[in-house]
């Protein structure tokens, strides 16, 4: 499944290079117009990242996101620095279908497990942003990649599987924003190890060949941001390559 994505800083559409706020590209686009275009081309899910909120919990762009959700028919998945149950509940209340939880799942595992019990596994997507070390271990980073988390991808998945984990977004940080292609070996490995989880691939997508490679890896979906913004290909072309599930 194709999941077009936009990242927002203070209401503007941006892209970061490898999660670095200092390496930011701003696009002169209306977020709603851009997402409406993706929707019109056939996207059933859209992914929005609140980068302002990820950096400063007191500056969350919830009002903007509420306006986007109300103006769109597609299902919306939102991430970016979710730290409290109130923030999670607020996003679900404004019509967000699924909330992406990253750093907190590493730092406050029991708290996030309780949210799975309360809100259900379909309302939450774990974001596992990994640095792969020389030993091949997939170490999950936290806090907008500004620090290593020290937990392996597998240990976190195993901690949440008893709570019904269904959706997980995995980014190889070394590929993010680089347009160097996805780490398909990573997705092939985790899809084989945990076939009952819907894996979303993210990071490095540049071409339709990259989309096809992820499709064939066993991942269930692919998040595409930069390649669409710089018009390497269109959402319509991506969906022709990897049709939405019926």
UniProtKB/Swiss-Prot annotation:
GO terms for molecular function: 1-(5-phosphoribosyl)-5-[(5-phosphoribosylamino)methylideneamino]imidazole-4-carboxamide isomerase activity. Coiled coil: none annotated. Its EC number is 5.3.1.16. It is an enzyme of class 5 (isomerase). GO terms for cellular component: cytoplasm. It is found in: Cytoplasm. One of its GO terms (biological process) is L-histidine biosynthetic process. Its main location: cytoplasm. PANTHER family: 1-(5-PHOSPHORIBOSYL)-5-[(5-PHOSPHORIBOSYLAMINO)METHYLIDENEAMINO] IMIDAZOLE-4-CARBOXAMIDE ISOMERASE (PTHR43090:SF2). This is 1-(5-phosphoribosyl)-5-[(5-phosphoribosylamino)methylideneamino] imidazole-4-carboxamide isomerase.
